[in-house]
């Protein structure tokens, strides 16, 4: 069952999750804490992902309060972001440099789309 065929979510593999944890630990050891770490996740359409699992998909309609798209980093957080490769740190202090910060919110509308090969790896390993 799927609530909305237009629903998009930010997602990454468990391997990417493990790598993010390791990078976070390494970065914290070298630079100290005081930040929230995130990752430039890719967007996946839930209908496309469901098709990898089954051909029998029933659309049941949105639930109250359910969003079609997902926000990871909001407009008010942009000025406090620091980009390190595929990682995004959100700190308390403002980032004065525009060279290594986000310029727009990071969400399932702005994120790169997951390819069919990536979805296959996500589902089937």
Which residues does each predicted region cover?
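Strand-loop microenvironment adjacent to phosphate/nucleotide-handling motifs in alpha/beta enzyme folds
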Residues: 1-125
């Amino acid at each position: 069952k799927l609530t909305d065929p237009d629903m998009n979510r930010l997602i990454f593999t468990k391997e990417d999750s493990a790598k993010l944890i390791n990078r976070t630990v390494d970065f914290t050891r070298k630079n100290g804490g005081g930040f929230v770490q995130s990752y430039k996740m890719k967007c996946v359409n839930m209908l496309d992902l469901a098709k990898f699992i089954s051909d029998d998909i029933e659309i049941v309609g949105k639930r109250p309060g359910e969003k079609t798209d997902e926000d990871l980093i909001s407009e008010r957080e942009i000025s406090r972001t620091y980009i390190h490769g595929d990682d995004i740190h959100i700190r308390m202090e403002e980032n004065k440099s525009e060279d290594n910060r986000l310029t727009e919110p990071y969400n399932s509308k702005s994120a790169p789309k997951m390819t069919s090969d990536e979805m296959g790896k996500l589902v089937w390993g």
